[in-house]
Amino acid sequence: MPGEIQVEVAYALPEKQYLRKVKLPEGASVEEAIIASGLLELRKDIDLKKNKVGIYSRPVKLADTLNDGDRVEIYRPLIADPKELRRQRAERAAKK
């Protein structure tokens, strides 16, 4: 159908991945795709004010316009500081 795009919305947890395909009108935003996917109702831990989003691993804003075939990704907050984890790994490696 002209004027319509299809995108995927993804949200990954350590034990499960959610992947929803949604059809939207051309010019739809990232936020509209997330809402249409139903993931906000399914996963109450998703807060669009806190969770960052991206398209194919590139950070985007909720108001950004989607293209046909895009994959919208909802990212979980970091639970550990990456620099601290690297430091700890380096210390463990130095002890071996």
From Swiss-Prot:
Family: Belongs to the UPF0125 (RnfH) family.
Organism of provenance: Cronobacter sakazakii (strain ATCC BAA-894)
Phylogenetic classification of the source organism: Bacteria, Pseudomonadati, Pseudomonadota, Gammaproteobacteria, Enterobacterales
Entry-linked Gene3D superfamilies: RnfH-like (3.10.20.280)
Protein name: Protein RnfH
Coiled-coil ranges per UniProt: none
UniProt-listed PANTHER family: UPF0125 PROTEIN RATB
InterPro entries found in the cross-reference section: Mopterin_synth/thiamin_S_b (IPR016155), RnfH (IPR005346), RnfH_sf (IPR037021)
